[in-house]
């Protein structure tokens, strides 16, 4: 069976390193499904979940919360470089919930003061928190 090596790398080190037969990520142009022998690609990634169908007897699926970054696909090696990434099993849900509440509060405050930059920053924080919460439930 043809397979790919999947690595997710952050400034904190390698967060994921396994063999897979299918990967799904989200780019600014939409969802991208990746199978072995995919053409070479470099693309930006959105804050979203990453689905990885591993090469295993039980057809296991792993989920990773990706907070943006870049994907490179070359010679059946998929490398994702991201500011941060967390596997579903590693997500601290209570921390993510607190981050969600904090971002919602920051959005409301920034909108009342018409601080556009702060609204944008808080919306990014909210997307990241919601992404982590959603991935933790997979």
From Swiss-Prot:
Cellular compartments annotated: Cell membrane
Keyword Glycosyltransferase tagged: no
Entry's Gene Ontology molecular function annotations: ATP binding; proton-transporting ATP synthase activity, rotational mechanism
Keywords: ATP synthesis, Cell membrane, CF(1), Hydrogen ion transport, Ion transport, Membrane, Transport
Family label: Belongs to the ATPase epsilon chain family.
Job of this protein: Produces ATP from ADP in the presence of a proton gradient across the membrane.
UniProt name for this protein: ATP synthase epsilon chain
Species the sequence originates in: Streptococcus equi subsp. equi (strain 4047)
């Amino acid at each position: 069976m043809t397979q790919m090596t999947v690595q997710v790398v952050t400034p904190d080190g390698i967060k994921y390193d396994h063999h897979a037969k299918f990967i799904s990520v989200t780019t600014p142009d939409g969802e991208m499904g990746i199978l072995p022998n995919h053409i070479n690609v470099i693309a930006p990634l959105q804050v979203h979940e990453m689905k990885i169908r591993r090469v295993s007897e039980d057809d296991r699926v792993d989920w990773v919360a990706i907070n943006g970054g870049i994907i490179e696909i070359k010679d059946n090696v998929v490398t994702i470089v991201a500011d941060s990434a967390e596997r579903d099993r590693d997500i601290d849900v209570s921390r993510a919930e607190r981050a969600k509440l904090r971002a919602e509060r920051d959005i409301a405050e920034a909108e009342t003061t018409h601080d556009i930059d702060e609204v944008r920053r808080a919306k990014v924080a909210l997307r990241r928190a919601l992404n982590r919460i959603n991935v933790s439930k997979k």
